[in-house]
């Protein structure tokens, strides 16, 4: 909750002079310090660069003045690579401005939820719901009794103005939104060309934090209307609504519910359930599941289609949403392939002189590691080839032995930590093997030796045993090493409550 306190202090300083307007905060130097000092989206191998002297208040003010002096409507697409506003270093300057906008617009929503949590007296318990893995126990408990499932991908808003207008219902500051529009148009002109059109809200590493914020606000509006339709279409009371969240960037309160969002839309988890339907969302993807006839699923399917078309002007066709039998369909969700498998058991029962064979069908929730996509990601990161054969990483060969081993171990631990919930660990062990051998080959390359010769010089492989023994060591701290519980947990699924983000290797489809 430290970020809320920082936001509260800075906002209170301006309230007495600016009457809650966000526009003056754009010219506050500490805003850009917050933007660079609280960067939680960096990759696992990147260090926090912090707030450097490049992102100074003077640069920000000059860029904003240029925005006002320039008519963005007359910029031709052919000049998009030489953006007049962004100057000679458009990537740096646009990042500075966008981070400042994001921090400013997130402040009131952070404060709003902070006050809501304090009133509800759940500030101390909110951390229990931060883990991405918190959703899978819900799957294990409920999905075994369901029959139909539908994967729904939430479409991107067709125009930035839709998201900006949605935001204006929450924040009343015309000068701020005028400046925000100027920046958004400038940025779009700099990245979109006739030869290479792209979606502004698509998941790209170069996308500023402000676009992720606008996308989440768009999803907020969509889910609030969806929840309203659910309440109006059913006479039954909503039995439960839960929100699971991780890194917190901004919040919103919808009537009596607290909806939680993050700066990265890949981090929001929410679900509600009643006697008929279950709804789960993670990233820009949601899942509808039901144990009843497909009629109810079709009803909600067309509800969503009409909602996107009529309220958000987003064209979507019914054919894009498919309704499948849960035990025949494997859906990709939160980095796992999940499905419900039917296990058939035969029991012999004897009554007097007659014996009977009774077939019992058991449903069990299974999770699988997406081995193909993970190998593709490892190949892109130069840890193996496209066939999954380990190779040396030439980029890291110039580092010290300790740094090389530490980097490989961090990746291996993160992947192992995230995928310990898989039903079968064979794929996870294969990923560990690729990283382990890639580490050895990288060390051998650095010392200009072969793998066999390097291992002989090393004398043993004890230095690299952590690739395979970490989970057992962690569990042995809780249970005796010889206990049956430890062996059962090590072989079974383990869901962690400290998974607060997923990196690109984990979260790639």
From Swiss-Prot:
Keywords: Chloroplast, mRNA processing, Plastid, RNA-binding, tRNA processing. InterPro entries: Domain_X, Maturase_MatK, Maturase_MatK_N. Belongs to the intron maturase 2 family. MatK subfamily. GO terms for biological process: mRNA processing; RNA splicing; tRNA processing. It is found in: Plastid, Chloroplast. Its main location: plastid. One of its GO terms (molecular function) is RNA binding. GO terms for cellular component: chloroplast. Usually encoded in the trnK tRNA gene intron. Probably assists in splicing its own and other chloroplast group II introns. It holds the Pfam family Intron_maturas2. PANTHER family: MATURASE K. This is Maturase K.
């Amino acid at each position: 909750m430290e970020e809320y306190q920082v936001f509260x202090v800075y906002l209170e300083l301006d309230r007495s002079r600016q009457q809650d307007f966000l526009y003056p905060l754009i010219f506050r130097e500490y805003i850009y310090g917050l933007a660079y000092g609280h960067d939680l989206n960096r990759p696992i191998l990147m260090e926090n660069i912090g707030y450097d002297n490049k992102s100074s208040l003077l640069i920000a003010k000059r860029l904003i003045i240029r925005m006002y002096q320039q008519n963005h409507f007359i910029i031709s697409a052919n000049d998009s690579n030489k953006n007049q506003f962004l100057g000679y270093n458009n990537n740096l300057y646009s990042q500075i401005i966008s981070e400042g906008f994001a921090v400013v617009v997130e402040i009131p929503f952070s404060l709003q939820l902070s006050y809501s949590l304090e009133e509800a007296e759940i500030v101390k318990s909110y951390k229990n719901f931060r883990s991405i893995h918190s959703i899978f126990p819900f799957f294990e408990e409920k999905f075994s009794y369901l029959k139909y499932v539908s994967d729904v991908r939430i479409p991107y808003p067709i125009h930035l103005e839709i998201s900006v207008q949605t935001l204006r219902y929450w924040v009343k500051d015309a000068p701020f939104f005028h400046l925000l529009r100027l920046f958004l148009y400038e940025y779009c002109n700099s990245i979109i060309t006739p030869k290479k059109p792209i979606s502004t809200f698509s998941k790209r590493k170069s996308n500023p934090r402000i676009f992720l914020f606008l996308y989440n606000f768009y999803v907020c509006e969509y889910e609030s209307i969806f929840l309203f339709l659910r309440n109006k279409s059913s006479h039954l009371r909503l039995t439960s609504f839960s929100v699971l969240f991780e890194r917190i960037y901004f919040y919103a309160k919808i009537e009596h519910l607290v909806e939680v969002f993050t700066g990265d839309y890949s981090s929001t988890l929410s679900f509600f359930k009643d006697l008929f339907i279950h709804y789960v969302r993670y990233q820009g993807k949601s899942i509808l599941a039901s144990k009843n006839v497909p009629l109810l699923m079709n009803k909600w399917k067309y509800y969503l289609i009409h909602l996107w078309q009529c309220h958000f002007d987003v064209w979507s066709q019914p054919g894009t949403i498919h309704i499948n039998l849960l035990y025949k369909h494997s859906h990709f969700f939160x980095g796992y392939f999940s499905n419900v498998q039917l296990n058939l058991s035969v029991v012999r029962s004897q009554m007097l002189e007659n014996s009977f064979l009774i077939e019992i069908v058991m449903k069990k929730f299974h999770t699988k590691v997406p081995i193909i996509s993970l190998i593709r990601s490892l190949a892109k990161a130069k840890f193996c080839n496209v066939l999954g054969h380990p190779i040396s990483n030439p980029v890291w060969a110039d580092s010290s032995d300790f740094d090389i081993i530490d980097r490989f171990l961090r990746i291996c631990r993160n992947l192992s930590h995230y995928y310990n919930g898989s039903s079968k660990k064979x794929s996870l062990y294969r990923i560990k093997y690729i990283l382990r051998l890639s580490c050895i080959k990288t060390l051998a390359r650095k010392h200009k030796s072969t793998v066999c010769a390097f291992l002989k010089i090393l004398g043993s492989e004890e230095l690299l045993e952590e690739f395979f023994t970490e989970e057992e060591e962690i569990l042995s701290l809780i249970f005796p090493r010889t206990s049956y519980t430890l062996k059962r947990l090590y072989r079974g699924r383990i869901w962690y409550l400290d998974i607060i983000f997923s990196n690109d290797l984990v979260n790639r489809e």
